[in-house]
From Swiss-Prot:
Stated family: Belongs to the universal ribosomal protein uL22 family.
Highest classification ranks of the organism: Eukaryota, Viridiplantae, Streptophyta, Embryophyta, Tracheophyta
Species in which this protein is naturally found: Atropa belladonna
Keyword check for Ribonucleoprotein: yes
Keyword Chloroplast: yes
Name of this protein: Large ribosomal subunit protein uL22c
Record's function text: This protein binds specifically to 23S rRNA.
Source superkingdom: Eukaryota
Main location: plastid
Amino acid sequence: MLKKKKTEVYALGEHISMSADKARRVIDQIRGRSYEETLMILELMPYRACYPILKLVYSAAANASYNMGSSEANLVISKAEVNGGTTVKKLKPRARGRSFPIKRSTCHITIVMKDISLNDEYVKMNSLKKTRWKKKSTAMTYHDMYNSGGLWDKK
């Protein structure tokens, strides 16, 4: 029996004092990219959300090297999500005894990294299995999209 080896590690940052929408703007740029490419993108982007996300990416890579012994060159961000956290509500005193509410939003950021070198071994093992539903023959048809024989082809 083959024991399935763990291929994913994650880093979780909770109660980061930032709007979830502002953090999502940065997370959408790095989702699905490699570790080195992610570091370059995060260091060059001019947003405040980049620094806590960069710390989480470093932490996830350290988790991968410590827990699985994998190299940083083989890591890919497979899943990155931002969820809204708690909202800190305060009152700001104003003139004439009034007060205005202040809402300070927080977010939770989760970054999941996958080691693609371990994933290739499973692809090799699964390719040895015989597929039963594979089609016998596939015929390719070529369609000329520039010369469709319509009205506009005639001069």
